[in-house]
Amino acid sequence: MRPALSDYRHLASGKVRELYRIDDEHLLFVATDRISAYDHILSSEIPDKGRILTAMSVFFFDLIDAPNHLAGPPDDPRIPEEVLGRALVVRQLEMLPVECVARGYLTGSGLIDYRKTGTLCGLTLPPGLTEASKFAEPLYTPASKAELGLHDENIDFAATVDLVGEKRAAQLRERTLQIYTQGADHALTKGIIIADTKFEFGVDPSGELVLADEVFTPDSSRYWYADAYREGQVQPSYDKQFVRNWLTGPESGWDRAADQPPPPLPAEIVDATRSRYIEAYERISGLSFAEWIGASA
């Protein structure tokens, strides 16, 4: 008989995830259908989103050549029925206070910083770059982890050294770029550009660096259509940039600068977001989402 969710002690809530303790060494990592944008948790949810994020992470954890935090399969008997398909049993780690961002292309906050200073996280970039310019080599551009509701801040490598020490900072940079390259190369064979992504790492009791949280999901990554890529233009995407674009467009009526909660998403935006997430999973994995645990039709 599977345990009930109430059998586990709730430890923490994030923008999208809930964390529960199973025992002294294992946690239950639950992905909800919540969606966040611009440091707000939206009132609207995206049906099946938690399952899509979980399915995508499981696929990439299996693909990537790096130790990860999984401690059981997605149908592990320790996972309660009510969260089956959107929860994972993971190892408890000492999490590191760095968002490890890898960028293959210039966009988002990186483009904003570049336009202001010509640099990104302490790295001097060549002149003449524009929206969606591809870097000669992927860049490691870390950020500090912010409290819930606050914004992560881009930092340079020296600041990472201050946070975790020189040896661990160098290891984070190397591992981040290795994982990004492997995942982005795979996605490109499926017609998808992973423009950038973020990883989180922890350390196990032996001191080994372990990939944790989520990996290459549409929440943590920018997914672009490879056949539609055009430098100098905002790219059509599979990820939650679609939601951000609606929120900052005239139809939403939302004034981001006023620091008011975003409005509910219209049904068509909810449906289109769900469809984009599913399409990203199916194209990248080659699997049918309908066959994932508990997926709705």
From Swiss-Prot:
Keyword Transport: no
UniProt keywords, alphabetically: ATP-binding, Ligase, Nucleotide-binding, Purine biosynthesis
GO terms, biological process: 'de novo' IMP biosynthetic process
Matching Pfam families: SAICAR_synt (PF01259)
Keyword Mitochondrion: no
GO molecular function ontology, one term from the record: ATP binding
GO cellular component: cytoplasm
EC numbers: 6.3.2.6
SUPFAM superfamilies the record matches: SAICAR synthase-like (SSF56104)
Pathway this chain belongs to: Purine metabolism; IMP biosynthesis via de novo pathway; 5-amino-1-(5-phospho-D-ribosyl)imidazole-4-carboxamide from 5-amino-1-(5-phospho-D-ribosyl)imidazole-4-carboxylate: step 1/2
Catalytic reaction equation(s): 5-amino-1-(5-phospho-D-ribosyl)imidazole-4-carboxylate + L-aspartate + ATP = (2S)-2-[5-amino-1-(5-phospho-beta-D-ribosyl)imidazole-4-carboxamido]succinate + ADP + phosphate + 2 H(+)
Family statement drawn from the similarity comment of this UniProt entry: Belongs to the SAICAR synthetase family.
Xref: HAMAP family: SAICAR_synth
Record's protein name: Phosphoribosylaminoimidazole-succinocarboxamide synthase
Gene: purC
